[in-house]
Regions:
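Gram-negative (and chloroplast) outer-membrane scaffold detector with strong preference
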Residues: 65-139
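Extracellular loop and loop/strand-boundary signature of outer-membrane beta-barrel proteins
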Residues: 39-45, 88-96, 140-145, 197-200
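Residues on the lipid-exposed face of transmembrane beta-strands in outer-membrane beta-barrel proteins
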Residues: 31, 57-61, 105-109, 129-133, ...
Length: 229
């Protein structure tokens, strides 16, 4: 059942992407560098200490003056070690490190019509949300049988800044809400087992991307009143 769901989502992503590529007059491509981070059984709150390198490439189509569609591939390292909150966590003393690969499609909403040549606005804050598939690999002895390909809901926000009619910069932070509790290889288990390799199976693991990107547009802001030249 879950395999069928993943196939349908992948088909949807590909269909939408090909449809949007046809609208070349509103197209953009970009790449970015940043970090993956994680919260779960080992680390309860976001901790910059566990940020690990990641990179992304993406395609964007502007559907209106404030709404855009984006398809992206993001990959990098993700991992953490135990941040003890009690005696049990100290005994468990677990850690993990994976290579994570993500494909996502999201819709973006910009609060300002920053591409309007009649306005002297070089920046806009924005929000985004969508759907993603991610997979991971690592040298982990699994505590349970599970699939390493899962679905996530990416959402977050950022700021974009225009450099000139063809290039702009972005700073973005996004959370990936998962429906999976084994990203850190720790979840529920037999509490009679004295190896302590179990956690809270009622709280799923989540991961995050914080990054900086540069974008190249394939359209030009009209020149007569262009404030960026």
């Amino acid at each position: 059942m879950f395999r069928t769901t993943r196939t349908l989502i992948a088909t949807y992503i590909l269909t939408v992407l090909l449809t949007q590529i046809a609208a070349a007059q509103s197209s953009e491509v970009g790449l970015g560098l940043g970090t993956f981070n994680y919260t779960g059984d080992l680390v309860k709150f976001y901790n910059f200490k566990f940020s690990k390198p990641a990179a992304t490439v993406f395609y964007r189509a502007n559907l209106s003056s404030v709404v855009s569609f984006r398809a992206a591939i993001t990959a990098g390292l993700i991992g953490a070690s135990e941040v003890p909150t009690d005696a049990f966590a100290s005994k468990r003393n677990s850690s993990f490190k994976h290579f994570l690969f993500e494909g996502s499609t999201v819709m973006e909403y910009h609060f300002l019509n920053w591409r309007d040549s009649k306005r002297f606005v070089r920046f806009t804050p924005y929000l985004f949300g969508g759907v993603a598939l991610f997979g991971f690999s690592g040298d982990v002895d699994r505590t349970q049988a599970y699939s390493t390909v899962q679905m996530a809901i990416p959402f977050g926000g950022g700021v974009k800044y225009v450099l000139n009619p063809k290039w702009y910069l972005s700073l973005e932070f996004g959370m990936r809400k998962t429906f999976f509790d084994y990203l850190d290889n720790i979840s529920g288990g037999d509490f009679r087992n004295k190896n302590y390799q179990y956690g809270n199976d009622s709280n799923n693991d989540h991961y995050y991307f914080l990054g900086f990107s540069i974008t190249r547009t394939f359209y030009t802001i009209p020149c007569p009143t262009n404030p960026y030249k």
